[in-house]
């Protein structure tokens, strides 16, 4: 084969092929054909189209389903049975300590006893111990904090236990119960004795908690504090003593958590008043009977804080308390002062904002 002839034929073929490609491209550009798009009528496409066309109805329906589910869960959580674990022989082994004895502590003690706890109440003297014994509940016991020997025996009773672990006593937590009433009282009517009594009771409760810290650490127990959340958030006029006490309790709980590393839970109440409420009497005979629904919410949250896996450090009783405490964080001080001045002029404040039965 002649190499020159072969090279000439190759060049000629390449030129012809390039000319055909150029002619084909020119033909396509001069006479464009419509591009047909094949849409797939799949189930996913139909579902997306339906959701888009009915987005308003779908949104309202989703919101209704969410609210219905939330309402059902709230109702179930409100009525579900809560009981403390017991030993194999059905003996009570879970212990809870109350920092003081007052009508609110009485309500909590009776409820914890009913749920399967052993309740130990820290009292100041024999008269308070006699009051606790009048409850006639074998698992609600008193411990006089001024008797050092009795306190030491109680502290050592958890470490000097023999036998299987299932039968051993376990300290679950200590509940700091607020003292003092939250009645509407102008500050000029508060005498020296009232101030001294309120802060003395508060300091005794703090001292009792401090004394129990080594035992709480060894038992990995929790500290639960109750405070009037609305009062500490707004510090309204004519509620000087309860506002100061509530703020002091919350500050004490935050300090405890940072200093000791214990699990500390603050339950903020909607300013419930149990001081004139007798748990054993009928509701008609009590001067300030609390709402049964709100009372049960408080007791349920105390139980969940004692035995829950991951308790929140701050819990609110009721949506109203949560809403008002949350709003107070964003309101400037001047706005709150103006609102209180307006309420003070028209005497609305004691009825519309704080009172809750």
Curated annotation (Swiss-Prot):
Location of this chain's protein in the cell: Cytoplasm
InterPro entries, per the entry: DUF1776_fun
One family name in Pfam for this protein: DUF1776
Primary localization: cytoplasm
GO biological process terms on file: steroid metabolic process
Alphabetically ordered keywords of this record: Cytoplasm, Phosphoprotein
GO molecular function terms attached to this record: oxidoreductase activity; steroid dehydrogenase activity
Positions where Phosphoserine occurs in the chain: 282
GO cellular component terms listed in the entry, alphabetical order: cytoplasm; mitochondrion
PANTHER family membership: 3BETA-HYDROXYSTEROID DEHYDROGENASE DHS-16 (PTHR43313:SF1), SHORT-CHAIN DEHYDROGENASE/REDUCTASE FAMILY 9C (PTHR43313)
Family: Belongs to the UPF0744 family.
Official protein name in the record: UPF0744 protein C106.03
Annotated organism of origin: Schizosaccharomyces pombe (strain 972 / ATCC 24843) (Fission yeast)
